[in-house]
């Protein structure tokens, strides 16, 4: 059976449980950030979740490429067979779970909620090729388990243990824990939600910052950056170097997210003092490939360079100088640059309308 999918709750959801528990002050900051644009990787992950849910539910799935089917769906289903080799599991896919009155308005969706004998099973699909996600002490899955225990009692009736499973083809990670551990997590979550609504809710940096959308404006991280730029590296001992290296990835992520936030603001016509949108440096392309072939032969270029038509850069290297009028410079998009950059600023539609009006 398949439950209706729902959006994740705003205060905390499965994927944000670790951040909210470790940094309750992040909730208010994230609420003020502009909405995120879904990446192509996220869209692909959503598609794969929908496809595998339909297959398990006995429905006709959306069409996907043969590569995705063979490298993601087939191995994922094979790994599911390791969890349920005898096909004994009672299960639901994409099922909404929540905490009821215990923590109002906090909910999420479990990819697969199941039960075999005295064991409840919480299974999450991960189709990304990046960092391998561990199941042990995974707060996202403990969130789903705690919420399912309150809202889907059938999966916990007579249960003495809970198994958290992450299938991330070609890997599978499994961890069996107790109902008592899920209860302790639930208490942690309750306390964090209570703290999150306070104006002085604590902020704390750590691994949970990785996917936080408020990272670019977080005072904890901006403070760490301020301290880092003042460090005199020649004076650091080996222990201090080790400590700074541990923080480096976090600061790299902060810088990347800050640039992305500023770029998105400029793309939307907002003003970032000292910065502007400019066209990316153009790549030369042939204006007319047929005319380019004729001109290159006349200039002395021979096969196979003409038959396959090499790039303007390669042709120029061989001929020393290209005939005039054969190429055009094409920009691949816009990028952010300081006002001191000599390239002219690109005005977005909203800015153009202001100038006209």
Language-model-derived ranges and their functions:
Residues 88-194:
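Mg2+/Mn2+-dependent nuclease catalytic core
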Residues 37, 41, 132-134, 237:
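Alpha-helix N-cap/helix-initiation motif
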Residues 253-357:
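Extended, charge-rich alpha-helical segments
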Residues 163, 182-250, 346-357:
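Short, charged, low-complexity amphipathic alpha-helix
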Residues 1-120, 248:
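Metal-dependent nuclease catalytic cores that hydrolyze phosphodiester bonds in DNA/RNA
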Residues 31-32, 63-67, 89-95, 203-210, ...:
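Short coil/turn segments at secondary-structure boundaries
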Residues 56, 127-130, 145-156, 194-197, ...:
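Hydrophobic/aromatic-lined pockets within catalytic cores
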Residues 52, 73, 189, 244-262:
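Short amphipathic alpha-helical coiled-coil/interface segments
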